């Protein structure tokens, strides 16, 4: 996916809260929106080179979104809204298994009963529901999710597990950086999520991880990654 904007370099100073940070842009301190609910403690550190996207709405509170951060071995996609757009493209191209067979329709933000899922996929002979999670934390060779406790993520897994006997269900982890080789749940951070993920897999929910490639022009599919539960 090519960016429809030109990333603007800045230097990160500090987070004011979960969604607001301070950067130095062209010699001036500026407040920016951080479109990611994670802690990002290992990524958004003082002095980190980051890249911004200028907003098109003149009435918005913060003029810029913090989209990318430069780690020693890789750029990191901080914007957690973009991975769903990337996932939709991968689904439509038949890259994400087990949805690689003939797809009639991919619909975003769909409800099933009381549950809301990132995607509903209509295959010729079956319906599928998918949740997408963006992964930014890496320790050694491992990409880890989550980087903060996520009761909402646990609920998503329980909902998918409940549907798995009647529908194709999957959790897709998009690794938003290039310096990881294996995905596993972050059981130290959120043992409830790790346990729910294992139970979902045992019930037949597909657990998939795909690594992305990044540069200042866009984000691209790299390869499927090993998942260790």
Curated annotation (Swiss-Prot):
Coiled-coil ranges (or none): none
A Gene Ontology molecular function term of the record: DNA binding
Family matches, as Gene3D superfamilies: 2.40.50.580, 3.40.1350.60
InterPro entries named among the record's database cross-references: SfsA, SfsA_C, SfsA_N
Source organism superkingdom: Bacteria
Family named by the database record: Belongs to the SfsA family.
Protein's name according to its UniProt entry: Sugar fermentation stimulation protein homolog
Gene that produces this protein: sfsA
């Amino acid at each position: 996916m090519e960016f429809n904007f030109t990333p603007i370099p800045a230097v990160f100073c500090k987070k004011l809260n979960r969604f607001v940070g301070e950067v130095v842009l062209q010699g001036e301190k500026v407040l920016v929106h951080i479109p990611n609910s994670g802690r990002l403690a290992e990524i958004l550190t003082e002095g980190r080179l980051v890249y911004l996207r200028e907003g098109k709405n003149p009435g918005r509170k913060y003029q810029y979104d913090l989209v990318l951060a430069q780690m020693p071995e890789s750029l990191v996609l901080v914007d957690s809204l973009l991975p769903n757009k990337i996932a939709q493209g991968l689904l439509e191209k038949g890259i994400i298994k087990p949805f690689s067979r003939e797809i009639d329709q991919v619909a975003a933000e769909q409800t099933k009963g009381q549950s809301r899922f990132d995607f509903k996929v209509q295959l010729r002979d079956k319906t599928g529901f998918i949740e997408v999670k963006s992964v930014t934390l890496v320790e050694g060779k491992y990409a880890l999710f989550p980087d903060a406790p996520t009761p909402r993520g646990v609920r998503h897994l329980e909902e998918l597990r409940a549907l798995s006997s009647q529908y194709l269900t999957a959790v897709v982890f998009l690794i938003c950086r290039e310096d990881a080789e294996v995905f596993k749940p972050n059981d130290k951070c959120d043992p409830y999520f790790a346990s729910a993920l294992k139970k979902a897999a045992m019930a037949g929910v597909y657990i998939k991880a795909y690594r992305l490639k990044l540069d200042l022009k866009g984000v691209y599919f790299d390869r499927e990654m090993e998942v260790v539960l």
